[in-house]
Amino acid sequence: MELNLEVIQREVIKPSSPAPHDRLQLSVIDFGIAEACVPMIFFYNLADLAEKSPDIVSTRLRSSLSQALSRFYPLAGKKEGVSISCNDEGAVFTEARTNLLLSEFLRNIDINSLKILIPTLAPGESLDSRPLLSVQATFFGSGSGLAVGICVSHCICDAASVSTFVRGWAATARGDSNDELSTPQFAEVAIHPPADISIHGSPFNALSEVREKCVTNRFVFESDKITKLKIVAASKSVPSPTRVEAVMSLIWRCARNASHANLIVPRATMMTQSMDLRLRIPTNVLSPDAIGNLQGVFFLKRGPGSEIEISEVVAEFRKEKEEFNEMIKENVNGGHTNTTLGQKIMSGIANYMSELKPNIDTYTMSSWCRKAFYEVDFGWGRPAWVGLGHQDIQDGVMYVLLVDAKDGEGVEVWVGIPEQDMAAFVCDQELLSYASLNPPVLI
């Protein structure tokens, strides 16, 4: 359902206590994706809340954000070249209102309307000069609900980092004791090598070389359908595939089929998946809550005439992940430095980047599952729904993002591909036998 908003106020929120005035060095990965952001929207049902006045709720959000920024102080800084100046410049907080009821909006989700729940650039503001963190609190009609939209610069945070920050902010809003709230490790160059402006003059843009602007759609895989898909995805080498392996393999197959439906001459295709280093490196080396773009990648490729069989892709998925995990294990147990490990991870990323070509369909896939986004409770309960505002964030990138469904067992998949491909993709009967296209969220 189309959403019309009225912006009530916009202000800069500074940390409640001064931050150390130092600089945070960006890694090669941070700098390379500096123009992208991580956009998320948390929807809350306030219908049964006693104190649901927008003024009261907004004050709590703003006050707790100021306190949270004292711990996550680089988010209140400014990107300058290949570093973050921790200068307490602050985050931008916008308050908006709509007459539409939350239940009405969630029953008929308009994918294109989601992006207006994410903070936009101010007049005269460029991608490079925007705040590292922007927040928008949108109040729905008759006190029915609230959407907290956040946009965090990708130069400082990946999805796991955003989860750590938002859960920390929410804990502050709930009034948790300071003993439970610690300052996280900002580990931008703990693994990956630092960016050098003389070498990395500008963020890389190879991912934007696709045929046309991408459009986004949402697909929901319920747990029972995932169970059936896993049976198809299983093989002798991988008898028990994960839901992420099975769903990503199906999506790649269907996206490739949609692309071929619009081409006279078939194209080669490639998919890449990022892997969270926090889950693979010992905690004495890297904190599970470390902030940064702490990812490695692997990729799979198919020629123009090759078929994409789900079980075969899953087997390759598993093999690549196991080899990646073994490489990390050997480096850590062998006493090698983080620099050595970072160089090996970067070598894999460089191999992937060298494969990016305009005549190859490349799908950038990430799993944001198990990131505890449904645990973000500001004091009025857990989210009724967590959505993404990923339209127009980085034009030209074909992406697939997996997030948990609210029950923790199903998966919501956000797919961004060229419009003509999407027209065929949403009609793929194999896909629709496992997934529902943008179903309502009932509260």
UniProtKB/Swiss-Prot annotation:
Constitutes with three contiguous genes an operon-like gene cluster that is involved in the thalianol pathway. This is BAHD acyltransferase At5g47980. Keywords: Acyltransferase, Transferase. GO terms for molecular function: acyltransferase activity. Probably involved in the modification of desaturated thalian-diol. Belongs to the plant acyltransferase family. The active site is at residues 154, 377. Its EC number is 2.3.1.-. Pfam families: Transferase. It is an enzyme of class 2 (transferase). Expressed primarily in the root epidermis. It comes from Arabidopsis thaliana.
